[in-house]
Swiss-Prot record:
It is a multi-pass membrane protein. This is Probable sugar efflux transporter. Pfam families: MFS_1 (PF07690). The gene is sotB. Involved in the efflux of sugars. The physiological role may be the reduction of the intracellular concentration of toxic sugars or sugar metabolites. One of its GO terms (cellular component) is plasma membrane. Keywords: Cell inner membrane, Cell membrane, Membrane, Sugar transport, Transmembrane, Transmembrane helix, Transport. The lineage of its organism: Bacteria, Pseudomonadati, Pseudomonadota, Gammaproteobacteria, Enterobacterales.
Length: 399
């Protein structure tokens, strides 16, 4: 009995450590969102040019997820994770010392390489290490780590950057990763790869119209969100004329509202995923259209951020449920593809946002983001009527 409780405790500790790792990996992807103005200032560049760093990072992750998954498919998982963390930490140290913008971009590419492999193996590892009968909870812990990065990671990164300089944000993430690595080394057993590394399931997945439709929806809606979200910090300061501190508060509110979205989805997501996703996309569309009108009043912006945060969290979780429901037989490859496609959207949104800021005006980012959001809303209503699939159809309850 004692051994069993100890092993359950250790199993949960392993999963929690992975969730913390997920938090750290996601925090670093989005940390620059809150630091664009500061980084631009120190290199004498425009924020829109610095924003290209987000696009490069996201597209490296998107391009490398599948190739790296195949290259590392035979590697023992514990050793692979340790190697990833060493690359991740070393790249953050380079970010800290970056003596030019080019060096900063190179350091970010190193981090993106580690990120691409990490996300292609994490869900499968969480499932393997979960206590018996607790796979769903283990996956939801990883999702929580990811979600919390949006909630607290970005604002905390921004606060550190405001008070100690943006370089300290990257150093702090590197130190957090070092502590997590120490825990992983202590807790993880040897984990031989169980993944065949075969791409045989790819053509099968792409022959599933429901899944392909969800992938298309993902890239369009994520592009819409990141067109505006990537530049929210300079928008608040230059267009709304509010302080840097207010930008931090707004990022905290937007992220914190994600918790409400997560709770709502937890209660209703399995049975009503389709309806919830469509409502959330409609809400995102409204927020993007109202971004500029709301910018003349700080309270209006705060209220808008709450709805925006709820919407984007429901969309992110909903897309994952749809992918898992459409590919219960190939979750590894399907989720790796999902991560890649999500990152294509992040990169595209950041790119569109930077071009709008450079060639139109930063004030227009909400309106331009609303165009793909409207397309996503129409597409979601079409595909969910055609394929009303939910996770429950594939995963009967096990008591």
């Amino acid at each position: 009995m004692t051994t069993n409780t100890v092993s359950r405790k250790v199993a949960w500790l392993r999963v929690v450590t992975l969730a913390i790792a997920a938090f750290i990996f996601n925090t670093t992807e989005f940390a620059p969102v809150g630091l664009l103005s500061d980084i631009a200032g120190s290199f004498g560049m425009e924020t829109a040019q610095v924003g290209m760093m987000l696009t490069i990072y996201a597209w490296v992750v998107a391009l490398m997820s599948l190739p790296f998954m195949l290259l590392t498919s035979k590697m023992e998982r514990r050793r692979l994770l340790i190697g990833l963390f060493i690359l991740f930490i070393a790249s953050h140290v380079l970010s800290f010392f970056a003596w030019s913008f080019d060096v900063l971009v190179i350091s970010r590419i190193g981090i993106a390489f580690a990120h691409a492999v990490f996300w292609s193996i994490t869900s499968a590892l969480a499932i393997r290490m979960a206590p018996p009968g607790k796979r769903a909870q283990a996956l939801s812990l990883i999702a929580t780590g990811t979600a919390l990065a949006m909630v607290f990671g970005i604002p905390i990164g921004r606060i550190i950057g405001q008070y100690f300089g943006w370089r300290m944000t990257f150093l702090a993430i590197g130190l957090g990763a070092l502590a997590t690595l120490a825990c992983l080394v202590k807790l993880l057993p040897t984990l031989p790869s169980e993944h065949s590394g075969s791409l045989k399931s790819l053509p099968v997945l792409f022959r599933r119209p429901a899944l392909v439709s969800v992938y298309i929806l993902t890239v369009v809606v994520v592009t819409a969100h990141y067109t505006a979200y990537s530049y929210i910090e300079p928008f608040v300061q230059t267009v709304a004329g509010l302080s840097g501190n207010f930008a931090t508060v707004l990022l905290l509110i937007l992220g914190g509202a994600g918790i409400i979205g997560s709770i709502l989805f937890g209660k209703l997501g399995n049975q009503h995923a389709s309806g919830l996703i469509s409502i959330a996309i409609g809400l995102l569309l409204a927020c993007l259209l109202l971004l500029l009108p709301a910018s003349d009043n700080a309270h209006h912006l705060m209220l808008l951020s709450i709805f925006w945060g709820v919407a984007i969290m429901i969309i992110g979780l909903g897309m994952q449920v749809k992918v898992l429901a459409s590919a219960p037989d190939a979750t590894d490859v399907a989720m790796s593809l999902f991560s890649g496609i999500f990152n294509i959207g992040i990169g595209a949104g950041a790119l569109v946002g930077s071009q709008v800021s450079l060639h139109l005006s930063m004030a227009s980012i909400g309106y331009i983001g609303a165009i793909p959001a409207l397309a996503a809303l129409v597409w979601s209503l079409m595909i969910f009527r055609r394929w009303p699939v939910s996770l429950e159809d594939h995963q009967p309850h096990h008591s």
